[in-house]
Amino acid sequence: MLNKMKPGGVVKIFLFLLLFVPSLLAQEYKVIHIKGDVKFRSNTSETWTELKGGQVLNLDEFISTGVKASVQIENLGNIIIIEELSAVSIASIKKMSTDELLLALAMEDMINVPKSDGKGKGNSGSTAVYGEKEGTEINTELNSDDFGIKRLNGAIQLAKNDLMGSSIIFAKETYRKYPNTKQIASYRIFFADVLYEKGLYEEALGEYIETQKLELSEEQRTNLNNRINDIDKLLLNH
C-alpha cells in the first residue's frame, strides 16, 4: 500500500519512525502500585501472569485489570493510572505531538485499506460480536473474552491520563483488530470528541459522519448533528 502514497508521505512516516521509536525504547515503565487483579502478558503469549509491584514492563507487553482493580505506572516522572476492566499495551503509554498523531492516523488508514478476497469484497477479520454500551463509563458486566471492549476502556484511560493522541491510535488499532467494536456508538463518539478537543476538526468530522450510520439514541443523534454543524461552521471560517 505504500506504493499508493505520495513519496513525501512515505518520507514523513519513515522520519517519524526514525525519530520517535528510539526515544520510546529508552523509556522505563515501572509498576508502583497495584490494587486487585492486574495481569500482564507479552504480544507473543496467550498466558496472563500476575503483575507485581516494582516490576518494570517491556514495550511489547499488555496489562489488563479486573473488576475494581487498578494499577499505577511511572514513566518519565509521570504517574499513569489504569482503572478497572481495561487493557492497554505498554507501547501505547506515551505522549504524542499533533504531527505524530496525524502521521500515525495516516499509517492506520494505510493498514485499514480492505483486502480483497478475490470476489470484490473486503475481509473484515474478527467475527466477535459486542453489544451497545451506554455512555463511556466502564462496563462491569464484561465476559472474560471481551478483550476488544477492555482495550477500548484502556484507550479511555489513556485519554483520562492526558495521553490524547495515544488514546485515539490505540482505539483505532482496536477497531482494526476487533472490527465489531466499531458498532458501539458511545465509544466512537468518545474518541471523535477527543479528536475535536485536539483541534483536528476534519478528522473528527469524518468520525462523526461514520458514527451517524450506527444505531443511536435520540440524545446521541442530536448531539452528533450539533457537533457536525459546529465543525462545518469552523471549517467554513478557515
Tell me the role of every PLM-derived stretch:
Residues 27-46, 66-69, 78, 84-86, ...:
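Glycine- and acidic-residue-biased ligand/ion/polar-headgroup-sensing regions
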Residues 177-182, 211-223:
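Short solvent-exposed coil/turn linkers within tandem alpha-helical repeat scaffolds
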